Curated annotation (Swiss-Prot):
Residues 1-10, 189-201, 767-777, 925-939 have a biased composition (Basic and acidic residues). This is Disks large-associated protein 3. It comes from the Eukaryota. Highly expressed in central and peripherical nervous system (at protein level). Residues 1-24, 52-96, 137-167, 181-289, 398-417, 529-582, 739-788, 906-939 are annotated as: Disordered. InterPro entries: SAPAP. The gene is Dlgap3. The modification Phosphoserine is found at S58, S404, S407, S410, S414, S641, S643, S930, S933, S965. The lineage of its organism: Eukaryota, Metazoa, Chordata, Craniata, Vertebrata. Residues 221-245 have a biased composition (Basic residues). The keyword Phosphoprotein applies.
Length: 977
């Protein structure tokens, strides 16, 4: 496919090129294709190559075949390219970028063998399509792969392998070029005779010219057949180092030019997509910013107007820009501030100086690939939020700025105004007809990204060109979306501090498969509604008048309590995605939020938990049949749990970073396939619907408190046994526990001893213990999960229950003994001491440990004790139980002696034998040794458990202190956006 034209022999080269190292080696060396002598050009250069000095501008003007290499500019000649760039596909960046763009040759030369010009109207459309970008700001750097030896343009960036091959990009770009070239060949069939006998329409598809590394002067128009080069480089893109253009010194000059080669920088980090003035049809690529004063030089364009635009070149540049935007490195993609779009700048307008440019900045383009960055579902493919790199600040900013544009679509809103709106904004759901751009991490109000989609100043684009471009891009790049998204490597992780944690929830929820955005008709529509491609699995948008306005209830709290924010959607399938703004007008963020029909009443003390009114069971069951939720990052969405029949109407409020596989809800111990060990509570209020307020004093509800702390607490009458609080936590790599804790406190059944007993009445304590033990026995079987550890909360609760029953039995027995017998005061004091210590132990430490056990099963409360914490606390509790047990054992000995007064005397005799231990008989020393061993064991146990207690208290204190600065590390590989 190489020998299309007969004039590809080598042209004579001047001797001054012999010492350069751009000499071509190999059979692929070809001579430049020079322009015909009849194709006159103005002597004024029309292309300002970046870093091209004045020496690069040839004063001689046009080149002709008759002149040959003798008409080369002073610094180089066409021979320098003849071989060096012979085998390239795209116009390669070479140091000798010429003063004019010879892609004009394929269509724009009036004398080119009887060819007719393109209509100026069509060329004007092309001029308006591509923004002026002569500042040299680097907008979209390609990610340079390891290929490419030598100090190339991209060698400054660290090589980073990409997951997709550049040949795929070339192939798709080639398809677009062929489409443009075919349409172009029908319009101008006779414009490419200079390269030989009537090359077919595809011959101009590569119609960007480049100058060789040796030609510092005028460029030589190498119009290589694009079809050939795409296949050629597909076959050898892995060994691109064989390119003869990569020789030695030729590479260090390549930054001075504006051309690309398909085997050069498609895979590099340093090749940036640049724009060009609409009147100057240079290549769309520039590698670097112009040096110093050259950036500010004014070059006059040729006066011929806008005839020089090649449709194939335009198509190639647009498709290349769009494709590179689609598949380039997302983390380096940013909107640069300095791009200036002059939609009216024709070739007659020169490039202005910086001060003039500052005055002339009227239009600021922001071009976004429309098939990738549409923000609303138009059906079809699976859309993803294209902000791959969502660092905490810019993630929120991007979510806030995504819908920042007013209805005119121009990105002129200041970031401060946008930041004021982000709290009432959703990250994915936008108007159907609004052109949205997901602004990459650094947002500047003046910005432009060259792309194949239309500029956001859509009023300047013609309808005809939009239709043609959308047809081509939609057909070519439509099938690419899912594969491109799969091929993109998501960054490793990002972390969100507590402030952005809250903001992400406030910023809105991103919908998943069956979560429809609530779309309403915008007040004014700019652009064409059908001109944005978005591939999302969601159904088509709801018609504007077919749904009620969204209803939302978002509660923002402190960072420690952000987990318990309730995001209560109203009932009905049309309201299932609540949004802070109705999106039915350009005044976004100013909507009055309409709450659910039964307005939820927040708790009077909101630092812990806010429980919203929840609709009845029938409604919840209907909702469960209608939908299934898959919450995602930045979302708190209520879901219906179907783990068991008695809890089927339970609602779950998933906080940020949680995404649950709904089809695995049958498993009690299901794992969340999402990220954070962040908290999320399933709250169900059973009974009276009006009693939606839960007084949560000192985080009692958060700690799962289901029993009274003191016997003197009055019974909360209105909240008696009316409802329960169900909680479930889903953490990554841990178990999900569901416990039902009846919140209302049962009245303490006082079974205290009537009559004048000096023993403190243990009735309230025992009644309270009975109540919470019953609750524990009721709630424990409901959890129904396989415990990963034998010594978990349930195991400790069972052990605690046995200990409590034993101690209560002893207390009751001693109290009956005190009532039945006339006991001396000393024995009564012992009984009071034992019973009082037991009551105190049961009312404080035992309840605390029971609360910790429930807390370990219910991680919605913060902090969640681990099994090691429970074991340490259990050992400490055993010391206290052991002390009480010794007192009861002493009382049992007194009872065995019929409560005689000599029992205390015997007890007094116990200490004296200790000093007489050496002189006592053998039997007594054995007893003393046993007592000493018991004491030693107790002391060792105390030391060991004190250390455990210190560790546990340190862990709890550190967890509590760090509650205000929680950092959630979200591995983005597991996160769906």
């Amino acid at each position: 496919m190489r020998g299309y034209h007969g004039d590809r022999g080598s042209h004579p080269r001047p001797a001054r090129f012999a010492d350069q190292q751009h000499m071509d080696v190999g059979p692929a060396a070809r001579a430049p294709y020079l322009l015909g002598s009849r194709e006159a050009f103005s002597t004024e250069p029309r292309f300002c190559a970046p870093r091209a000095g004045l020496g690069h501008l040839s004063p001689e003007g046009p080149l002709s075949l008759s002149e040959g290499p003798s008409s080369v500019g002073p610094e180089g000649g066409p021979g320098g390219v003849g071989a060096g760039g012979g085998s390239s596909t795209f116009p390669r960046m070479y140091p000798g970028q010429g003063p004019f763009d010879t892609c004009e040759d394929c269509v724009g030369h009036p004398q080119g063998k009887g060819a007719t010009r393109l209509p100026p109207t069509l060329l004007d459309q092309f001029e308006k399509q591509l923004p002026v970008q002569q500042d040299g700001f680097h907008t979209l750097p390609y990610q340079r792969g390891p290929a490419g030896p030598g100090p190339g343009p991209g060698s400054g960036a660290a090589p980073e392998a990409r997951s997709e091959s550049p040949s795929r990009i070339r192939h798709l770009v080639h398809s677009v070029q062929k489409l443009f070239a075919k349409s172009h060949s029908l319009e101008a069939p006779g414009k490419r005779d200079y390269n030989g006998p009537k090359a077919d329409g595809r011959g101009s598809s590569g119609g960007d010219s480049y100058s060789g590394p040796g030609s510092g002067g005028t460029p030589t128009s190498h119009h290589h057949h694009h079809h050939h080069h795409h296949h050629h480089h597909q076959s050898r893109h892995g060994k691109r180092s064989k390119s003869k253009d990569r020789k030695g010194d030729g590479r260090h000059q390549t930054k001075a030019t504006g051309w690309w080669s398909s085997d050069d920088n498609l895979d590099s980090d340093s090749g940036f997509l640049g724009g060009r003035p609409p009147g100057e049809p240079g290549g769309p690529f520039c590698l670097d910013a112009p040096d110093g004063s050259y950036r500010d030089l004014s070059f006059k364009g040729r006066s011929g107007g806008s005839e020089g635009r090649c449709l194939a070149c335009t198509g190639m540049s647009m498709s290349l820009d769009g494709q590179s935007v689609k598949r380039s490195a997302w983390h380096t993609m940013m909107v640069s501030q300095g791009r200036d779009g002059y939609p009216g700048a024709g070739p007659g307008k020169g490039l202005l100086g910086p001060e003039t440019k500052a005055k002339a900045r009227t239009y600021h383009y922001l071009q976004v690939p429309q098939d990738d960055w549409g923000g609303y579902p138009t059906g079809g493919k699976d859309g993803e939020i294209p902000c791959r790199r969502m660092r905490s600040g810019s993630y929120i900013k991007a979510m806030g700025d995504e819908e920042s544009g007013d209805s005119d679509g121009s990105p002129k809103t200041s970031p401060k105004a946008l930041a004021r709106r982000f709290a009432s904004r959703r990250s994915s759901s936008v108007d159907t007809a609004r052109i949205n751009c997901c602004v990459p991490p650094r947002i500047h109000p003046r910005s432009s990204i060259p792309g194949y989609s239309r500029s956001l100043t859509t009023g300047q684009l013609s309808e005809e060109f939009n239709q043609q471009l959308e047809a081509v891009c939609g057909s070519v790049f439509g099938e690419l979306e899912s594969q491109a998204v799969d091929a993109l490597d998501l960054p490793g992780c990002f972390r969100m501090r507590s402030h952005s944690y809250l903001r992400a929830i406030q910023a809105g929820c991103s919908q998943d498969d069956d979560c429809l955005p609530l779309l309403a008709a915008p007040a004014s529509v700019s652009g064409r509604p059908g001109s944005s491609f978005n591939f999302r699995k969601a159904p088509p948008p709801i018609p504007p008048g077919s749904q009620a306005p969204p209803r939302i209830s978002i509660t923002a709290q402190s960072s420690t309590d952000s987990a318990h924010e309730s995001f209560t959607a109203a009932e009905g399938p049309a309201r299932r995605c609540s949004s802070a703004d109705g999106l039915d007008g350009p005044t976004m963020g100013a909507r009055t939020l309409e709450l659910a029909p039964v307005p939820p009443r927040a708790s009077p003390k909101p630092p812990t938990l806010i429980i919203k009114t929840i609709p009845g069971r029938e409604e919840l069951r209907s909702l469960a049949r209608q939908r299934k939720w898959r919450p995602s990052i930045g979302v708190q969405v209520e879901t219906i749990s179907d783990s068991d029949t008695e809890n089927r109407s339970r609602r779950e409020f998933h906080s940020i970073g949680v995404q649950v596989e709904e089809d695995k809800r049958r498993a009690r111990f299901k794992r969340s396939n999402s990220v954070t060990a962040g908290v999320q509570a399933d709250l169900e209020l059973e009974g009276l619907a009006g009693l939606a307020t839960v007084a949560t004093e000192d985080k009692a509800l958060q700690f799962g408190r289901s029993f009274q702390r003191h016997a003197s607490e009055p019974q909360p009458g209105p909240r008696a046994p009316t409802y329960s609080v169900f909680r479930t936590v889903h953490t990554q790599g841990q178990w999900a526990y569901r416990e039902g804790y009846p919140l209302p406190y049962e009245p303490p059944a006082t079974d205290g001893s009537p009559g004048p007993t000096p023993v403190p009445a243990p009735g309230p304590g025992s009644g309270r213990r009975d109540s919470w033990m019953e609750r524990g026995s009721r709630s424990l079987p409901d959890s129904g999960r396989t415990s990963p550890c034998p010594r978990d909360g349930e195991w400790f609760i069972k052990m605690l229950r046995a200990e409590v029953e034993k101690l209560e039995h002893w207390c009751q027995q001693m109290e009956r003994e005190a009532e039945d017998y006339e006991l001396p005061e000393e024995i009564l004091e012992k009984i009071r001491s034992a019973v009082g210590s037991t009551q105190l132990l049961l009312s404080q430490k035992v309840q605390q440990f029971f609360r910790l056990c429930q807390q370990s099963l219910d991680p919605t409360a913060f902090p969640v004790p681990t099994f090691q914490d429970l074991a340490g606390f259990w050992d400490l509790l055993q010391l206290s139980i052991e002390d009480v047990t010794l007192k009861f054992l002493e009382l049992q000995q007194l009872k065995a002696n019929s409560w005689k007064l000599l029992e205390p005397k015997e007890e007094k005799k116990v200490p004296p034998p200790i000093p007489k231990k050496p002189s006592r008989g053998r039997g007594v020393p054995v007893k003393e040794r046993s007592l000493d061993s018991v004491d030693r064991q107790r002391q060792e146990a105390r030391k060991r458990l004190l250390a455990a207690k210190r560790a546990a208290s340190f862990r709890h204190s550190s967890a509590t202190e760090s509650a205000d600065s929680i950092e959630i590390y979200i591995p983005e590989a597991q996160t769906r956006l």
